[in-house]
Every structure is written in C-alpha cells, then in structure tokens.
C-alpha cells in the first residue's frame, strides 16, 4: 500500500482539493481530503485518442518511453502503417512489442489496407481478414475508415467491414476531411463515430451536431488546434485530443498531449474541459481500462508542478511509477528487425526520369502546361495549379528558382515503373529528400533539385532497405529504419537527434517547411485532397481518378 499527497484534480466532479490517494494492488483504494504542504498536483494520466505509433519512427516499446515522460498513460493506436507493409504479421509485431513497456496501448483493426485500390501495398486486409481481427480481444476498435466515397456509395467490402465492427460491438473511427451535407449524414449514419480530419471550425461543428466526436489533432505536420480549440469549451463532451502523426523530435522537444493542455490554458480554456478532452472522453468513448482517479479505478495518474506550466514530475501506470525526476523507470529491451523491401537500385535512364516536354502551338512558351501539386506547410491537403515546366535539352527538369521540383514515387515491393510528377512549395534549392515513409502504402518517395540528386537519394534508401535520406548526390545523410522501413529500434532520443540533423540539412538545402519529411510523406496519400502522386500515377483525389501530368488544352 502506498500513499500520495498533493492537490487532487478531480476531473469527473470538476473540483480541486488538498488530499491523499491510497494505492494498493494497482488500484486506487481511497481518495480523501487531507491538509498538507505539498504543492504538486495529482490528476489522471493523459490519453492520446488517435496515434500511429509508427510515425514516431520508433517501435512501440521505445515510443512508450517518450510518451510516459510527457504524462501519457495510454494511447488509442491504429497500426495502419505497418499493416500496409506487413499485414497481420505487422499488427502482431506491434502488439508484441507494446507489451515490452507498461504504457497502455489499445490497438485497432486497420480498415483500409491498402488505403485505395490505386496503389501498390505489401498487404491486403479484406473484409474476411478484418472480421477475423475484430473478433480478437486484443484489438479494440475499427480504425479510421478513410474510404469515405466507399461508405457514401455503399461499396460491399466497405459495408462488410462496418458490419463486422457492429457485430463485435466495437467503435468505428472515421476519417472524413471536408465531408459535409448529405454525404456526411450518410457517413455518420452507418455508425462511424469520430473524425480527426476536420480542418475548418464550421466543418467540425456540423459533424458534432450530427453526433460525431471530434478529435483535435496536433501532430508534426497536420496541426488543427489553432483552428478548433474553442470547441473544447463549446462542446466539452464531444471533443478529444490526439496527435495522429508525431515525429520523435516533436514528442521529445515539444511534448505530447501535455503540450495541448498548456496551450489550451494560454487560450483561456477551462482546465476541467481540457482534462475531459485529454482523458475522460477517450476513456469513455472507447471503453478503455484506464483510471480516472476514482476509487476502484486502475491507478493511472500523473503529478505536475502546477496546472499552468504543466511540467510532468511523475507518471504512474497501474500503481507503478514509470517516470520520475526526468528518468524513465522501465528498461529498454532489444527488438528484432522486421521488414519487407524488394526494390533494386535505379538509374536516370532506366527509371526514365528524363520526361520530354510536350509542344503546342497554342502557347507563347511553345509547350503544354503540367499539373503541379501545391504543398501546404502544416497541412495534409494539397492544392493544384497549372504551370509551364522548365525544359533543358527537350526534357522537363526541376525549377528551383520557381520552386517547382520533380517528385518521384516508386514501389518498394517490386521493380515497377517510376512515377513522375512536379511539386511546389518544398523549397529545395539543391539536393534531394527521400523517404520510405510515404502514406499509406509506404512506397519510396523523393523530391529533388536535379535528377542525379533524386537517383542517389533513392538508391541510398534501397541500400538501407528503408528510412529517410537528405543531401546532394555527393553528400547524403540518412536515418535507416530497419523495422518495416518505418521504425528504428534505437532509443527515442537518438532517433530524434538524428532526425533533427536531417531536418537541419534539408533547411540548409533551401526548404522552409516546418517538417519537410512529414510533409513529403503525405504527398502520396491518395485519400486526402487534392492532387497526389502514387506509385501508379498522378491522382486527383477530388475526382477519385488518375490524371495525366500534362493538362488538357
């Protein structure tokens, strides 16, 4: 039996008082008022309501070390990324490795593997596989249903997955960027209960009024807190907090859910509403076995210096102190590498990177315009515009002066043809960046100032069988990711440090993006508008069809 004194923040009854909690056998035995001189605050541990652990570039047991240091005791996690690469084997890897740490990880069943039929993935989880996985007790919900056209149009395989979740009594997570009106009503009507993709206030309010829970996302690239934070006070029972995709440097240097508690208070939000969004709502919505600092609950709680600065002093999970005084108190265990990577190196000629410009007599420049992806810093959605390409020796090349760069996507699963597009707002003046983290099928994606830079960056990835790369053809820096080409087995601090070096190098090469590799990773995600490049071609998400690089006359 252990006792802890502090100012207890009772989020359920919305009050603070000096008191003592008694813990026995991993449970909270008593919570009682008691006078003392301790100034620390005791409150329920935080919950990330939607996260892809793979985006931390660390395996679950290493991610846990970063999370508990920020007061996180549980996460609702979608193993969608590794499932696209390794299928059920990848899901089992995540489950197994998560047990090497005390962090409570509640995995879901990926609903869209692959995300679309328009790209190559390492696995397919069809309706039969999803039904089988949902029957498992160690998988808690149906992960984000990204195929909203399939829901609205009633595709049989999509509807079968939704019915399996209902049959098992499990929550269905949503993913519906920009979905409004009648289509949204249809989407919610089939039982989809959450959305973390709202990028306007009006869209989020419409979804809440139709019965959805809104997850306010603040990750490394997609950041919606500034737009949506007022919902926390306006609709306190309908909002949760999540990161979705956070890189290791963000987790270590900026924080996890704790940073949103701080920012919310800076905005003048009610502290109890913030804690409700960060703890109570996800626990209740997903039915998580996570304590809310009540008698009889699991002893999952944190102590902080004060509620404004919200510096986490200690973290307890099931009554055990797992973090205190700046130290993680559970060991880091060796993790075996697992991967699927079947690509050989490329060359400029073999990859056909030299794409001829098409001439026309209708333009003063004497050539046809091309479709250009327009990246937006801090957002997953892109725009598109038409532009005249830069041409050398009859071939289209990157144009760093106009910030229109060549981008390639190629399958990691086979030596299939290289797909070529052009992108604006990456900002490189020289060199290239490349990654095997490329949502959602995690093929190889690269952007560069010259074809040579692109080829050398891609080939370094092939040598490493995955990871991220930055630099010029003559001087490349890399971070190998030996687990599925998505995650490292190194300590989170080391991964974060190396990742920061790569970001700094990318900035030296000209980019001003806050998180260039995170932005790059979403330029092949064919379910988020507007124009993306997959391993089978240029894809207009709004039209849900492939389009030609050259614009129509």
Curated annotation (Swiss-Prot):
GO terms for molecular function: adenine deaminase activity. GO terms for biological process: adenine catabolic process. It catalyses: adenine + H2O + H(+) = hypoxanthine + NH4(+). CDD domains: AdeC (cd01295). The keyword Plastid does not apply. The gene is ade. PANTHER family: ADENINE DEAMINASE, N-ACETYLGLUCOSAMINE-6-PHOSPHATE DEACETYLASE. This is Adenine deaminase. HAMAP family: Adenine_deamin (MF_01518). It comes from Methanosarcina acetivorans (strain ATCC 35395 / DSM 2834 / JCM 12185 / C2A). Its EC number is 3.5.4.2. Keywords: Hydrolase, Manganese.
